[in-house]
């Protein structure tokens, strides 16, 4: 999260210092939806009467989390996401990634090139990728105690739960896609084709729909501050049964 001290230290305490070499002083708050209510209130005092040279960008994918007083004092500029193919092309050309890696980063970025670049350089994301691959490949044979241990490990390693849900949504999307089309080229996780093929053969359409619905329910529960371990346990049990 972005706390009140972050806003005070990085914006409020420095905005009065005039720029030296340009007419504007620009602040960019990435993932601004992570600002706490206290942080938003601290920023509000600044954006009500900013210096004429100051420009503050609040970058977000979810404006609904902002206080109405923040939204009313901002000009909203809506940017369309890039196509996955455009993000992938950039990653291949500029970061020299393997095509299979670029497919995964482009999917997770959801049209946000900056996020794709960050994910490609993130060790935390590589850990998440490894952990989640193990889970989806072995879930059917794991007993309840192993599932609970896995959930606790996610919590201890402070892995991004929303990205975990994204991973599972993309994975089972691939399973369903391959079950319908039998086209490897349509997969996000192309390198995992053998496992995806195996799961698609043993899972029915109704079961896969139940799994995807359970992921959506987990998102809703986490957003409503339901206990994290309970939300994931309920989801994983549905996945195991289907």
Tell me the role of every PLM-derived stretch.
Residues 30-36, 41-48, 64:
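Catalytic acidic motif of RecA-like/P-loop NTPases
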Residues 1-38, 200:
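Clamp-loader machinery-focused feature within the broader ASCE/P-loop NTPase space
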Residues 13-17, 46, 93-94, 163:
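A generic secondary-structure signal
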Residues 13, 45, 68, 72:
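Conserved adenine-binding aromatic site and its adjacent loop/helix in ATP-hydrolyzing domains
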